Amino acid sequence: MKPVDCFLHCPKCGQPAAQPGNAPFHCAACGFLLYFNPAIAAGAVLLAPDDTVLLIRRAKDPHRGKLSVPGGFVDAGEVAEDALRREIREEVGLSLERLDYFCSLPNSYHYRGVTYQVLDFFFLGRVTAKAVQTDPAEVSEVCWIRREEIALEEIAFDSVREMLRRFLSQSSS
């Protein structure tokens, strides 16, 4: 189910939707128009001094038990870099000053029966040490992995898998 599928009636005037499931939602009775833009998320490839990559094992759904990069959703009023720094602090207890933009990719986030469209912004960062402090509600395991040992089939999201594919091909050239 997509978010637009939840609107069977106009949220402004209460009239039944003339064409439920169409995006944007448009009410024929009062003219109300509601867009369903993607949510924004940010993630980072974090490199240690020995050039290993930090991957986390997700502790919750979607994709519990799969690997991903640290990151999460951008809150209203936040810029992607600040949201990413916050998420990295919350998930693995690391503070980063410098983040370099790498790429952006669309993603679908399936959660509790609803599929959200997301635009993921990815960054590259370096850490000075591998000591982390995880939030067990978010992260079940931290893995420092050599680039050539990253198993893309173990990665949680299509966008993260594609970003890592690009990162790995760029690093090997």
Q: Where does each model-flagged region fall?
A:
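Residues immediately within or flanking Cys/His clusters that coordinate Zn2+
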Residues: 5-9, 24
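Short cysteine-rich clusters marking metal-coordination/redox-active sites
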Residues: 10-13, 27-30
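Short Cys/His-rich "knuckle" micro-motifs
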Residues: 18-24, 36-40
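A short coil-to-beta-strand element that immediately follows conserved catalytic motifs
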Residues: 20, 95-104
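Conserved N-terminal beta-strand and adjoining loop/helix that marks the start
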Residues: 29-53, 73
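Conserved Nudix-box catalytic region and its N-terminal flanking loop in Nudix hydrolases
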Residues: 48-90
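Active-site-adjacent beta-strand/loop module that shapes the phosphate/pyrophosphate-binding cleft
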Residues: 103-131
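NUDIX/MutT-family hydrolases
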Residues: 133-164
